[in-house]
């Protein structure tokens, strides 16, 4: 029992948060042997298939978004820069995260070793954080353009570029510390993908403070930004709809934008809510046992965002969708369907003047 309590200090590159009736826990290293003691082979194969789907679908839809934006000039608006940034970060996670997890789940252990774990953990964290902060920037930019809190402020190319650079800076601020000694990257969940150490406490890695830093800096702040900006946007649109009660198009825009905002906020919570809740629970319940299969879910939901975020922010955007249909299937969609009635970035035409 004494040896088990020292385990977090003895192993620099992994942690086994379950009790094993063995004298040599290193023999169960997730870098050396299949983790059959953590779950049935069917669980690993199912996760492998899921990661393969995320890799293929995530790569395809995000590459399509980038290529489509390059091909069609009308998509290269300042407000769409951040959507391309989101697609790049999603593609980053698909290539460096989902593909690695697919093979690791297939082998049932992290075959790429401790160094590979640090690389995969870092790259996945960077991609995830860029995606997270990009969603906050999307909300902020739409608030600035539609609600016009700065009066006659004009959103220009430098602002759009700054909005794309900001998420990468924030991501580096979140992803670099575990490489520098504040927390660490280790296998998580079923030990087939890597991320920050949520599990261990009271050690030299100071994981508790890092988890709280991530919760505040990378969840609470972006989420508060999203809720505030979209809340203000909805208020603005309701006022515009009330002022133009006889306009069917304005009423339709308000309804569709409201649905879009609900979907956006819900999508953010699905992606990052479980991670935030799980991390806080682990820190608040030090030493409490938990099912590693359940601990895999937050990571999977974050990787799955590479597919459902483009669906929310790109495919539900009629202008993007019409261009994609034309590029892939050579099929034209009627111009009125490609209008921006459901597109938050272009509903400023119904916003009241200030």
Swiss-Prot record:
PROSITE patterns linked: G_PROTEIN_RECEP_F1_1, G_PROTEIN_RECEP_F1_2, OPSIN
Modified residues (N6-(retinylidene)lysine): 303
S-S bonds: 117-194
Entry comment describing in which tissues the protein is expressed: Retinal long single cone outer segments.
Presence of keyword Signal: no
Superkingdom of source: Eukaryota
Keywords (A to Z) from UniProt: Chromophore, Disulfide bond, G-protein coupled receptor, Glycoprotein, Membrane, Phosphoprotein, Photoreceptor protein, Receptor, Retinal protein, Sensory transduction, Transducer, Transmembrane, Transmembrane helix, Vision
Protein topology in the membrane: Multi-pass membrane protein
BP GO terms, sorted: cellular response to light stimulus; detection of visible light; G protein-coupled receptor signaling pathway; phototaxis; phototransduction; visual perception
Residue ranges annotated as Cytoplasmic topological domain: 69-80, 141-159, 238-259, 317-354
Free-text description of this protein's post-translational modifications in UniProt: Phosphorylated on some or all of the serine and threonine residues present in the C-terminal region.
TM helices/strands, residue ranges: 44-68, 81-106, 121-140, 160-183, 210-237, 260-283, 292-316
CC terms in the record's Gene Ontology section: photoreceptor outer segment; plasma membrane
Location within or outside the cell: Membrane
Positions in the Extracellular compartment: 1-43, 107-120, 184-209, 284-291
InterPro entries per record: GPCR_opsins (IPR050125), GPCR_Rhodpsn (IPR000276), GPCR_Rhodpsn_7TM (IPR017452), Opsin (IPR001760), Opsin_blue (IPR001521), Retinal_BS (IPR027430)
Reported function: Visual pigments are the light-absorbing molecules that mediate vision. They consist of an apoprotein, opsin, covalently linked to cis-retinal.
Similarity remark: Belongs to the G-protein coupled receptor 1 family. Opsin subfamily.
Record-given protein name: Opsin-1, short-wave-sensitive 2
Organism (species): Danio rerio
């Amino acid at each position: 029992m004494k040896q088990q309590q020292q385990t977090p200090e003895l192993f620099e590159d992994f942690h086994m948060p379950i009790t094993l009736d063995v004298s040599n826990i290193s023999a169960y290293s997730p870098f050396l042997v299949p983790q059959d003691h953590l779950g049935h082979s069917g669980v690993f194969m199912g996760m492998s298939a899921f990661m393969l789907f995320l890799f293929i679908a995530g790569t395809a839809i995000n590459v399509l978004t980038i290529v489509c934006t390059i091909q069609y000039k009308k998509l290269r608006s300042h407000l769409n820069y951040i959507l391309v940034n989101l697609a790049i970060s999603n593609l980053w996670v698909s290539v460096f995260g989902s593909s690695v997890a697919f093979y690791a789940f297939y082998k049932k252990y992290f075959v790429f070793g401790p160094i590979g774990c640090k690389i995969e953990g870092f790259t996945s964290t960077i991609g995830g954080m860029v995606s997270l902060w990009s969603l906050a920037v999307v909300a902020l930019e739409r608030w600035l353009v539609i609600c016009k809190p700065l009066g006659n402020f004009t959103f220009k190319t430098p602002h759009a570029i700054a909005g794309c650079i900001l998420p990468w800076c924030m991501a580096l601020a979140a992803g670099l510390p575990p490489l520098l000694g504040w927390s660490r990257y280790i296998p998580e969940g079923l030990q087939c993908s890597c991320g920050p150490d949520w599990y261990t406490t009271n050690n030299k890695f100071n994981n508790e403070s890092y988890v709280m830093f991530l919760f505040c800096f990378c969840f609470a702040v972006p989420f508060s930004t999203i809720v505030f900006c979209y809340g203000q946007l909805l208020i603005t649109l309701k006022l515009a709809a009330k002022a133009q009660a006889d306009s069917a198009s304005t009423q339709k825009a308000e309804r569709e934008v409201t649905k879009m905002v609900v979907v956006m906020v819900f999508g953010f919570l699905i992606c990052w809510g479980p991670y935030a809740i799980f991390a806080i629970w682990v820190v608040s319940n030090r030493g409490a046992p938990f099912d590693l299969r359940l601990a895999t879910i937050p990571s999977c939901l974050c990787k799955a965002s590479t597919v459902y975020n483009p669906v929310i922010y790109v495919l539900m955007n009629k202008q993007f969708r019409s261009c994609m249909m034309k590029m892939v299937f050579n099929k034209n969609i009627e111009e009125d369907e490609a209008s921006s009635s459901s597109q938050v970035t272009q509903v400023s035409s119904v916003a009241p003047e200030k």
